[in-house]
């Protein structure tokens, strides 16, 4: 049923798109690259939204929300401010010039060399960063949603990944290279409707599941209140000073990055260049802004609900696997018969992003290099043909290179690190070019070079040297400093050696430049809504929390869940339980404040068991020697679980459980024997390459038999008495 609903939705979207655009002209530059400048505001809004939205947003932003809470909505909500700026200031400038690309505008403003350099920068990062990343993340999502491992048994994960990448890539090529911008825009609109339905559908089923696990009597709003009450500090728009997006960065680097992306990024704003007129473009941009305000509901809230379920032990997630949060939530709450539809919607979003980037790459090459440098007199048919050939070549290269991203430690880190290298310098010269009249092309060229080199050094340079240079400043503040340096360079240059004649922008008469009469009112209302959203969930006190890591309370809650199970099974009295919980939280905080990495799964597990073991050993009179042996074993296994594969981790857990059982019951001789033999069984299993879990279980079983022979019925009695404790420990290790 999943694969059937997937195919049906894609077929419906493709057929409807063909029916709508079947008579369009794609033989001319304007027809192919700008949809004949005929796009209306619904198409522009949907195309902007879908070109932006792909699996790196759906998966990455929800994963960040799982770790950080509501504060990560900044990437969605601050985008609205940028879209208002686009409608009010940037779009009139671009449309008045009649340009097809951003580098073409820079060529008009500064000169041919500046436009060519900008063209090369855009193309380089689209081909080597954006397109492969879209293909890879989309393929991973497609593989999981459609369960390709079951559909294609016998194939390796690598082979399945290649198949998924080429499937998405070839579909994207068909839409982008043969249909042009209008085909992409129509498909984006259809997928956009499906995405909104699918995104809100996930929220509906997730909140319904919250109600189900609480007795099934809660309404949707009551379910949302349950999540909020359980984790109130996650519902804070301001975040903490050490959050991924501290509140202060909303006015510095986060704003600048959003302004570049929504106001000057060719992949995005090419849709607005195809508008019928300025009014249609402004309405489309502002409608997109309104839709972006809904983004946190399906890009942030699901991640927070996933955290709620994880803390309840219903989802196998921790802070190190937050990238899996959205996928696991979808699998957990969505009925099977809807999985195919949602998969098709998600892949539609991927196709929209891929189509947008590929179409923009073709446009940049055809207009900037082929017609601009190689064949200036080329007729439209040849220009379009050159774009299609170039697009096909880079699509094949990207489909071949995308699987290599599987070896990247974090694709989201890869994206964030490389994006700033080109977007800050480009945004600086565009803004200065629009606001000034005398900055010469040499100043812009130097600023581009200095900006790329400087940010590349700050991103990939020696960490100690970068730390000294920046003084530990937040990376988004650093981006702002670089931006201001580049603006200063161009400002000083224009004062010392200005261009001979002031730049005067000419009206190319390409479209009707009559503005939408309600653009200022609509934009103002959007800005008010942004302020209200932030104010509604603001917690100013969190801004003063300088000592705490972004979300140590998450580890507090997870640790408390584990500890409560074990202490209840061990019949520790409530007063002592409170003391132990307080000590566990203090130990986690102390670890976070140290020079080591923040607390993670292994650290939390280790702290919980060592703390309980210490208190229980004292109460039961267990010797210090055996308690020390237990602590060492916990240390060793915690370290191993953080480094080794899951099967080795699972295999070594019975050794801890068996030894923990023996120690807490005071069977000192058997504990020592179990410890040694279980360790030996684990080592042997690892060396021989056998199934580690079976080997250790067999080893532990053999040890238990020998201990039973030595101690008689005593061990059997003890084992039966604490079987519930063992089950709790086992489930905790697996769940965490």
Protein language model features and the residues they cover:
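Extended non-catalytic scaffold regions that mediate assembly and binding
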Residues: 572, 580-584, 588-601, 630, ...
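Solvent-exposed, acidic/flexible segments
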Residues: 319, 323, 573, 577, ...
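Immediate post-signal-peptide N-terminus of mature secreted/exported proteins
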Residues: 551-582
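Charged, low-complexity interaction regions
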Residues: 567-576, 592-602, 619-624, 642-649
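Composition-driven recognition of long, low-complexity, acid-poor segments enriched in small hydrophobic
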Residues: 580, 584, 608, 612, ...
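Residue-level detector of well-ordered alpha-helical segments, enriched
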Residues: 357, 361, 603-604, 655
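Membrane-embedded helix-loop-helix hairpins and adjacent transmembrane boundary segments
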Residues: 1-561
